[in-house]
Amino acid sequence: MMLGPEGGEGYVVKLRGLPWSCSIEDVQNFLSDCTIHDGVAGVHFIYTREGRQSGEAFVELESEDDVKLALKKDRESMGHRYIEVFKSHRTEMDWVLKHSGPNSADSANDGFVRLRGLPFGCTKEEIVQFFSGLEIVPNGITLPVDPEGKITGEAFVQFASQELAEKALGKHKERIGHRYIEVFKSSQEEVRSYSDPPLKFMSVQRPGPYDRPGTARRYIGIVKQAGLDRMRSGAYSAGYGGYEEYSGLSDGYGFTTDLFGRDLSYCLSGMYDHRYGDSEFTVQSTTGHCVHMRGLPYKATENDIYNFFSPLNPVRVHIEIGPDGRVTGEADVEFATHEEAVAAMSKDRANMQHRYIELFLNSTTGASNGAYSSQVMQGMGVSAAQATYSGLESQSVSGCYGAGYSGQNSMGGYD
């Protein structure tokens, strides 16, 4: 094991902005002036929860001089991409590699995947046929429903083994009927999050399956925040309002899509009235650990957002849709823990394409595990002062995020 100047932290740099097709050889060529520790074994790509390259990598080097040479490569190009180079350390590298990728410590190996984009009228037989050759456990398909008891167009499928679930991910973007189906890694915990008791919902007329986006009859999945003073408590309430076990339900999903091909029924389930000072309606969170994004490019997709926060693994992304049926440039991103939400704040004012993104924290420490958080947060670039301001060292996490919305007096009020 190589020893560094800080008690075994080694000589590590992190690269960001790598092309998706980047290879170890490409990294070696980019850092040709540096000596990489253990050669090819010293390059560690970071993967998304779907098993794809995230565009980031850690590289172990031989000496402090090699680190200095690597840092001089910051903002130089690899192909058509310019690469950012940051100084890192072994603690950050080990933590990130452990908590990223499809086989991360954060991913329960229970054989679940999540489907999104199921077509109108999709039946249980079609889901089984979609995964033909992959064994699904008895009663292994869960169909979430919206507050009115209607199927949402998503499904959870549990396979007989984790290996089969990994194979199922290979069906991503294949078709059922005329619809491309997205397949994501999931867990039993995520399935359970859909079974929590629903809050009191606002009655809004649901459209028929062929209504166009932007019409007055569009179904808006907004909820009244029960027992909270708007958003000032800093904690969303959990639950999407029950789920329906696999029992042959095949009701109409009422899907429609926006200009970018996203399912409005899904996007709108995460929409809230964005007149922040006046509205009592907020998006529900399944975890209570949320980061709000502002300034997104209008063509930004959920994958863009997942990649933006990489190597962190958001639980869910809600892209906001305005009353006119168009994206607003804002989104809510849920994380599994308070520590991950705080770590995500290190990306505040970072760029997505040509836009810099503002982030606002809305999370509480109730479900956090702080034993490792201070070291990890600093490794992720979050200062102790920011962590304190964000609630890691404070018992009071109310008001700032909500106040920033209510009066728009704060551009970045963290909890």
From Swiss-Prot:
Biological process annotations from GO: mRNA processing; regulation of RNA splicing; RNA splicing
Biological role: Component of the heterogeneous nuclear ribonucleoprotein (hnRNP) complexes which provide the substrate for the processing events that pre-mRNAs undergo before becoming functional, translatable mRNAs in the cytoplasm. Plays a role in the regulation of alternative splicing events. Binds G-rich sequences in pre-mRNAs and keeps target RNA in an unfolded state.
Modified residues (Phosphoserine): S104, S107, S161, S187, S193, S195, S265
Protein name: Heterogeneous nuclear ribonucleoprotein F
N6-acetyllysine PTM sites in chain numbering: K200, K224
Quaternary structure and interacting proteins, as annotated: Identified in the spliceosome C complex. Interacts with AGO1, AGO2, TBP and TXNL4/DIM1.
Compartments in which it is found: Nucleus, Nucleoplasm
Cross-link (Glycyl lysine isopeptide (Lys-Gly) (interchain with G-Cter in SUMO)) at residue(s): K72
UniProt lineage: Eukaryota, Metazoa, Chordata, Craniata, Vertebrata
InterPro entries xref list: ESRP (IPR050666), Nucleotide-bd_a/b_plait_sf (IPR012677), RBD_domain_sf (IPR035979), RRM_dom (IPR000504), Znf_CHHC (IPR012996)
Disulphide-bonded residues: none
N-acetylmethionine modification, residue list: M1, M2
PTM info: Sumoylated.
Residue(s) at site: Interaction with RNA: R16, W20, R52, R75, R116, F120, K150, K173, R294, Y298, R326, R349
Record-listed cross-link Glycyl lysine isopeptide (Lys-Gly) (interchain with G-Cter in SUMO2), residues: K87, K167, K185, K200, K224
Domain named RRM: residues: 11-90, 111-188, 289-366
Notes concerning its domains: The N-terminal RRM domains are responsible for recognizing the G-tract of BCL-X RNA.
